[in-house]
A protein has these predicted regions:
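Extracellular adhesion/carbohydrate-binding repeat motifs centered on closely spaced tryptophans
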Residues: 1-256
Length: 256
């Protein structure tokens, strides 16, 4: 994948990621006399005996380089022994956040390895695709459940309002869910079949409810459009039927 990144200076520590700054066990500074030789836009690494580094990690002046099968230092996004790494234009291995041109992100740990799967940074969760090490955005299905990540790849919790005005709800683990949800003092009901909030007159678990144009459950009196009829919805949202005493007055509600 050839994607030129924008390197961020964002300083965030990943939970479950190593936080040390010591050298990786796989990268050991070479104690022999060494020489970094420029070749085109890359480099070769020559040992004192005249041989060159091939398929090898080398540390020079504190910077880490990887020399491929052709003996040239690699640059850009590279997969080495199944792990993604990133090297700048000078072929130096990078750590920390990288934002790609398509808006996704990768995080390279202290040893340069890209993190994958679920990761948390300062309390914000991200999911990095195990096959690409790039963060997910928008609606994605993970482990059989829909999740939503915003434009910055951050996992979303709570109510999301879509462009068409419909709403979905994501629980504390970021999973789309259904059922009753209270938010900012209002009650909503999310259909389990599609995860969307319901509106208007709805029968739920054997009781009738009414949800307004903003998907919020209605309580109190409701006058129906186009007819001279009223209904009453208790504080729990359930519609009144039959003979009821409300506010000291007797009312009779038909079965419709």
């Amino acid at each position: 994948v050839s994607v030129r990144p924008e390197i961020q200076s964002e300083d965030a520590g990943a939970e479950n990621a190593a936080g040390g700054a010591e050298d990786s066990d796989d990268v050991v500074p070479d104690e022999r006399e060494r020489s970094l030789l420029a070749e085109g836009s890359s480099f070769r690494y020559e040992y004192a005996d005249g041989s060159f580094a091939v398929d090898a990690w080398v540390i020079v002046d504190g910077a880490r380089y990887y020399f491929g099968a052709d003996g040239l230092a690699v640059a850009g996004r590279q997969k080495i022994e199944g792990i993604w790494y990133f090297f700048d234009d000078e072929c130096r291995m990078q750590t920390g956040w990288v934002t790609w041109k398509n808006g996704t992100k990768s995080f390279f740990d202290w040893d340069g390895r890209a993190l994958t799967g679920w990761r948390s940074f300062n309390g914000v969760k991200y999911y990095f695709d195990p096959s690409t090490a790039m963060s997910l955005r928008w609606s994605r299905k993970l482990d059989g459940r829909w999740c939503y990540f915003d434009s910055a790849s951050r996992m979303t919790k709570g109510i999301v309002t879509w462009k068409d005005g419909t709403k979905s709800y994501y629980d504390s683990r970021g999973r789309e869910t259904g059922g009753w949800v209270q938010s900012d003092g209002a009650w909503y009901y999310f259909d389990w079949s599609d995860g969307k909030a319901v509106r208007w007159h709805q029968k739920i678990d054997g009781h009738w409810y009414y949800f307004d144009s903003d998907y919020q459950m209605h309580t109190g009196w409701l006058k129906w459009d186009g007819v001279q009829k009223w209904s009453y919805f208790y504080s729990n949202g359930q519609q009144a039927f039959g003979t009821q005493i409300i506010g000291g007055y007797r009312y009779v509600f038909d079965s419709n």
